[in-house]
Amino acid sequence: MTIRSILQYAVPALALACASLPAAASTVRIYVTNSAGDSIDVIDPVSNKVVQKIKDIIGAHGIAFSPDASRVYVSNEETSTLDVFDRKTGKLIKKVPLSDHPNNISVTRNGDRIVVAIARGKGGLDIVDAATLTLKKTIPANGGRLHNVYVTPDNKYVVGGSIPSKTFYVFDLDKEAFAWAMPMDLGVRCMAIETNADGSTKRVFSQMSSLNGFAVIDFAEQKETARVTLPGVPQEFDHGGYRTNEPSHGIGVTPDNKTLWVTSIPNNAAYAYSLPDLKLIGKVDLPSEKIAGHDKLLSAVANWVTFTPDGKELFVSNSGMRSVSVVDTAAMKVVKVIPVGEVPKRNNTLVIPDTAGNAAAPAPAKRASAQ
């Protein structure tokens, strides 16, 4: 399902970067969920080719991994389950029933729990026990239906956002309880986390409904300190009209904590901002397509981002073009476009340890993103 098919047949695309990047290991893989297909593509970032497919999963959304790289966790919107796969074989281990319809997921640093955003019903945060693969509890969010959730790099909190309640939420991971919330004026979508020198959370950068840019949240002060709008373009790209309420969807902080990358659907680009000063340092144009009878070029519809552990490459899922763009972050250009499945949504980086004895303990999570 490309944007061409969306425009020609008016087929609505499913909606829609953040798992931690391990510090060192022998093999890196980029996982991409195909939200309108029935598979997950696994990319080798050395060859930039798909080297594995996890098949027979419809409704794949968020994706994360166990620290030892043995399991792949996927939130399944079709069955309202957390699907657990064997990483090597791609075979399903178990479908864990959740409290309601899920969205994004994240994993604790030691891998003992998987946290799942619940986007329907009463909402809240589901906690899945990784040892028993059962739903441990649901933490209420004062009626908030959560969209994206992320375990903070210091493993102390889970941060999340709600689109309908327009609220930024924080949960205490040790107590497994609601901590605090901050009302916003727009729906809260994708997030990225900037850390202090000690690994604690400094700022959260959050993309918002109807904002072609992002909000800046001071975590300690519990307040919004800035709002950044992405640069304008002479003419916006066509995106089929189905993502007008989420123009900026896909955001991430590089593993070295020095650069923030932000995508734009109408601008069809990814922008780089230096940290901590948030100065614009570059723009990368994403793939586009020309269709007869349409005045504008078609946007790739950037959806989510993830990095290689060294931060040299950025992978952008193009949900409108069944592909993933590989961006050289130093050269500021797309170096490869990799075909994947239908409406690629979330992507994530996995580093497989050298041996079974080497834990793939994630380095501080720098990125989070999109719907």
Predicted regions and their residues:
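Predominantly soluble domains enriched in secretory-pathway, periplasmic, or organellar proteins
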Residues: 4-5, 14, 18-371
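Cationic, low-complexity basic patches in intrinsically disordered or flexible, solvent-exposed regions
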Residues: 9
